[in-house]
Regions:
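Acidic/aromatic-lined carbohydrate-recognition and catalytic surfaces
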Residues: 1-178, 182
Length: 183
């Protein structure tokens, strides 16, 4: 009987910005990770776990994603990511990524268009209340509810104020997230 790969995996987690700088700008990047794949494999790792590399304003170390379909430019390009995948697989390494689907950045297109009225359907991708419904606190301090003047309501943010929580009760949001996950 063959066990699932993840049961016996040796996982090496990488925070890309501090791992290996390939171009001398002081910020680790995808090319830097590629340069160290042989080293990672020599440690016995079978899986690389990447912390967020998506486009982000970096309020919360990349966990405030503004575009699930783009790489943060300081970390590289989509071509660099494709190269990382190819090179890792050639060495027998799997690559997994942080899946941040509790919230987005307030700079994400969904939040921007939903709050500006440009695409009102996106407003319901987030959790809104006209009045603060409770006294929940944010992990980052203060209230977990932030008032948005454009909408005239409070949105939930369990983390930073610039990380509005997603409304998983909305089937359209779930479809968007599932589409991104299978991309």
């Amino acid at each position: 009987m063959q066990t699932e790969w993840w049961k016996d995996a040796v996982v090496y987690q990488i925070y890309p910005r501090s791992f290996q700088d390939s171009n001398g700008d002081g910020i680790g990047d995808l090319r830097g990770i590629i340069q160290r794949l042989d080293y990672i494999r020599s440690l016995g790792a079978t899986v690389i776990w990447l912390c967020p590399i998506y486009a982000s304003p970096l309020i919360d170390n990349g966990y405030d994603i503004s575009d699930y379909y783009a790489i943060h430019p300081e970390l590289g390009t989509m071509e660099d990511f494709d190269c990382l995948l190819r090179q890792a697989h050639q060495r027998g390494l799997r690559v997994i990524m942080d899946l941040v689907v509790n919230h987005t950045s307030d700079q994400h297109r969904w939040f921007q268009e939903g709050t500006s009225g440009q695409n009102p359907a996106y407003r319901d991708y987030y959790i809104w209340e006209t009045e603060k419904p409770n006294r929940w606190g944010s992990w980052f301090g203060g209230s977990a509810w932030e008032y948005n003047t454009q909408v005239g309501a409070h949105y939930l943010h369990i983390f930073a104020k610039k990380q509005p929580d997603l409304n998983w009760q909305n089937p359209a949001l779930r479809d968007e997230i599932y589409r991104m996950m299978s991309w």
